[in-house]
Amino acid sequence: MPALRPALLWALLALWLCWAAPAHALQCRDGYEPCVNKGMCVTYHSGTGYCKCPEGFLGEYCQHRDPCEKNRCQNGGTCVAQAMLGKATCRCASGFTGEDCQYSTPHPCFVSRPCLNGGTCHMLSRDTYECTCQVGFTGKECQWTDACLSHLCANGSTCTTVANQFSCKCLTGFTGQKCETDVNECDIPGHCQHGGTCLNLPGSYQCQCLQGFTGQYCDRLYVPCAHSPCVNGGTCRQTGDFTFECNCLPETVRNKRNRALGKRQASLEWKRTR
């Protein structure tokens, strides 16, 4: 069999592609609607079809929202939709660059890329910028390692970074580089008055008062009925320098007796049923 010439092979290949293409292309048929989002299937003379999409949709089957519907391109940039992918890019006007055309060409964010260690540069004005640093870095240009990550401040204190150094702001009652040391307030005399004893606590202290005195610093005389210790309308009566008794309302006494009687009867009933 004689060998086929290259030109004939190309012609046969092209003919095959023409016949085979409709089998793989979009088909508009009765009872079959390939287009979504109210797209309309339109048939070519060759028998193949395409989806005519309504405003706001694109893609082979109108399956994508138009990414240019909300144009994010700044400074006069033009939004260019990639229909098959449902994505968009910005074609920037002269003098601007960036994914959204947000940078002027000579802006530091674009020219010198000042934000280090993966930081993101944000343009504040034509000549100024601000860096948003990745976790673990700090500084105007994210040039410092965040020392607070490796130096934890203790006892609820707050860590701040200055350059590549850390500083702990301690809560009252603690001291030390990392606020790890409890301040013993009892080392300073005079906290507790009238012979009260100072008891050191973590981050604080407490005064244990002598009989006859009360208050945070044992600075007030103890009056038994001063703080109205009796509840449910009872009346406090001082019986001594440091003692008192409560005179309860009759209804309160009766309720207590009834509750006690009820508990006793319930106990007897329970014993009878055993």
Swiss-Prot record:
InterPro entries linked: EGF-like_Ca-bd_dom (IPR001881), EGF-like_CS (IPR013032), EGF-like_dom (IPR000742), EGF-type_Asp/Asn_hydroxyl_site (IPR000152), EGF_Ca-bd_CS (IPR018097), NOTCH1_EGF-like (IPR049883)
GO molecular function: calcium ion binding
Annotated PROSITE patterns: ASX_HYDROXYL (PS00010), EGF_1 (PS00022), EGF_2 (PS01186), EGF_3 (PS50026), EGF_CA (PS01187)
Keyword vocabulary terms for this entry: Calcium, Disulfide bond, EGF-like domain, Repeat, Signal
Residues spanning the signal sequence: 1-25
Family: Belongs to the NOTCH family.
Entry protein name: Notch homolog 2 N-terminal-like protein R
Gene name in the database record: NOTCH2NLR
